[in-house]
Amino acid sequence: MKNWLICIDDTDDIGTKGTGEIAEEIAHLLANMSGGHASFVTRHQLFVHPDIPYTSHNSAMCFALRSPLTQAEIHQHAVAHLVAESAPAADPGIAILDVDSYYDAAALMDFGRRAKVEVITKAAAYDLAEQLNIQLTEHGGTGQGVIGALAGLGLRLMGSDGRVKGQIKLGQFEDVSLELSVADILEQTGLDAVMSTDKYRLALDERVQLKGKVKAVYLDHQFVLLVHQETEQWRNAGKQALQAY
């Protein structure tokens, strides 16, 4: 089996299925058809600027895939689903990286960092993809999604950028908290760790109060539930802490 990173961007429009949901569907499709394994999907925030078209937040969606499928097979099946599910007004792009191949990871990560703070052209994205032997293709509209798709690969490679798509729902509510051990949280969610906002890794027997919207992040190349300490009690991190990802 080989290791791949796959990222898509700009598949949606107001009132249509979100890019994150489409990415999850592609991840499950590729894993199930090949007996492989797909990771959580991570959402990577890109530059918000009047010159950049976006639906709501301008973010790319990326996942890792371990699979015996060839790159051609991955591209064929992923693109078929991408095209079928993308909104008619969207400008979708997809990037596929063979993680086990030789490529300039520093250049790819630099592209990702730049895409968070500046406007980048399609030509620049295609030039870098060609240099790094990354498959980068557009599938409708202006094809602007290729920029975010390539940037998302770089940001995922950095290892400490992005939130895990969706919310963690273990029985907590907006006004009702739930207390669980770290071990229970990891077992029920499939996350790798529970860490404080200053990167202290909680022990398995420590307890955390969950309340409201609970989201995980990608930190130190792991899927992590962020927490903070409040009145000597660990609680899930709030919106402000999550904005850094």
Task: List where the protein language model places each region.
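Conserved mixed alpha/beta catalytic, RNA-binding, or beta-rich assembly cores of soluble enzyme
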Residues: K2-Y245
